[in-house]
């Protein structure tokens, strides 16, 4: 994993503007605004506000990106305060290799060692078998089905939680 960089715009476009990649997230996002999104993400990662990591399958080729995994805090929208959420995307040509699960586990291990994130929530689409399998395999607890608003769209998701300090076993 490496922090997002300003030259990751093409990877963002491939992930966020593609109808297949965004199928479970309500459809592709418009290309306009992606450059600004990358700049914001670079700033937030550099400030250590959010952990926005690019999945790099080969450290010798850091420009080859397989996807992204992100850990961030936000208001739960229901008056319950801040929650920590994790999300990930893996490009089609890299799917099925275990990279998503490894990236999520690695970021959760870093969160455990850092100690500031607390319980982590994940909201994969109800029909996203691979992402729900990652949650199961890493010890997330299934909370239930949950509507989530993303980019002005209401998504049908499964709500999972994990406490990295308690639920992750050391490798």
Which positions does each model-derived feature cover?
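Short histidine
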Residues: 124, 131, 143
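A local structural micro-motif
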Residues: 24, 102, 119-120, 143
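Helix N-cap/coil-helix junction residues
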Residues: 99, 116-117, 140
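Conserved GNAT acetyl-CoA-binding A-motif
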Residues: 114-123
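Charged, low-complexity surface patches
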Residues: 83, 100, 124
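Conserved acetyl-CoA-binding loop-helix of GNAT-fold acetyltransferases
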Residues: 89-90, 96-111, 129-137
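GNAT-family acyltransferases
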Residues: 1-93, 109-110, 114, 141-144, ...
């Amino acid at each position: 994993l490496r922090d997002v960089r300003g030259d990751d715009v093409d990877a963002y476009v491939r992930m966020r503007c593609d109808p297949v990649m965004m199928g479970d997230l309500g459809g592709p996002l418009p290309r306009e605004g992606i450059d600004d999104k990358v700049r914001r993400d670079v700033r937030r990662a550099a400030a250590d506000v959010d952990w926005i990591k690019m999945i790099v399958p080969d450290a010798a080729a850091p420009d080859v990106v397989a996807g992204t995994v992100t850990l961030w805090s936000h208001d739960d929208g229901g008056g319950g305060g801040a929650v920590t959420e994790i999300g990930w995307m893996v490009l089609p040509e890299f799917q099925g290799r275990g990279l998503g699960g490894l990236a999520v586990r690695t970021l959760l291990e870093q969160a455990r060692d850092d100690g500031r994130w607390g319980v982590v929530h994940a909201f994969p689409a109800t029909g996203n078998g691979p992402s729900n399998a990652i949650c199961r395999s890493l010890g997330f607890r299934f909370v239930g089905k949950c509507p989530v608003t993303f980019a002005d769209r209401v998504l049908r998701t499964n709500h999972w939680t994990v406490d990295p300090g308690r639920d992750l076993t050391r490798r």
